[in-house]
Regions:
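Glycine-rich beta-strand-to-loop/alpha-helix junction loops that act as flexible
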Residues: 1
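Structured mid-to-C-terminal alpha-helical surface segments
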Residues: 4-13, 21-240
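Non-catalytic nucleic-acid-binding interfaces of large nucleic-acid enzymes and RNP effectors
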Residues: 16
């Protein structure tokens, strides 16, 4: 939802909300209590929320946490969606205030959110860590769109630090040669290109964006981060 708002895709096909909590215990009982309290707020919009399931997110995901399936009801309409709640994410240098425009009301609300650099860093780490096994075309689209539409708002020094902090949080490190090989494989892989074409057909907002354009933008910018990271102490980039 945050990325959709940032790049101006108002009706993006997503049913996911990702959030992180600070200074609170993260377990099923407390997470349920928090979401129930939020859902009980009276806004006179007629929408009612019901938690349908709660479970722990296991280690195979990018981050451990709690996943909640929720059903929103408005008269006869029902809309399921999920909320993933994590804790102590490495937001570098820190959360920022973001004005989120509401869908059904002509106003915005203030929320604390990731800064652009941390948002990009998490997706870049996922792209490198998963390599050819990454089936989440949304990650590639998000990086491309943010790098192109918000380039003047991105600090590469902050992005480098955010990338390093994300890798440390997720306990990953990458050698220079490994980065180059992974990016070359991503760029040239016919399987990823086919998945991209399916993603493009299923999502109108992608328009006629080719895999070549997307992968080139991603490769160029991750290589730039790699170049910077090897020149700062405490880096997660390893020299071969």
């Amino acid at each position: 939802m945050l990325v959709a708002s940032i790049v101006g895709v108002d009706m993006r096909a997503t049913m996911d909300i990702d959030t992180t909590v600070k200074a609170l215990p993260l377990n099923e009982k407390d997470a349920r209590a928090i979401i129930e309290r939020i859902g009980e707020l009276q806004l006179e919009d007629g929408v009612k929320f019901k938690i349908t399931s709660v479970k722990e997110i296991m280690e195979e995901f990018d981050y451990p946490g709690i996943r909640m399936m929720i059903e929103a009801n408005l008269e006869r309409m029902r809309q399921p969606f999920k909320i993933d709640i994590s804790t102590d994410d490495a937001i570098t240098p820190g959360a920022v205030e973001y004005k989120y425009k509401l869908m059904f009301e002509d106003r915005s609300i203030s929320v604390l959110s990731y800064n652009l650099e941390t948002l990009l860093a998490e997706k870049m780490q996922t792209i490198l860590a998963r390599g050819l096994a990454n089936t989440r075309m949304r990650d590639f689209y998000d990086v491309y769109e943010i790098m192109n539409s918000k380039a003047d708002q991105i600090s590469f020094d902050v992005l480098k630090k955010a990338f390093a902090a994300t890798c440390m949080k997720r306990e990953t490190s990458f050698g220079e040669e490994e980065v180059g090989e992974t990016l070359d494989k991503i760029k040239d892989d016919s399987g990823l290109e086919e998945m991209w074409n399916r993603f493009k057909r299923a999502n109108y907002f992608v328009d006629d964006l080719s895999w070549g354009e997307v992968s080139e933008t991603i490769v160029d910018n991750i290589e730039k981060i790699s170049f910077l990271a090897t020149r700062f102490p405490g880096s997660v980039m390893k020299r071969e």
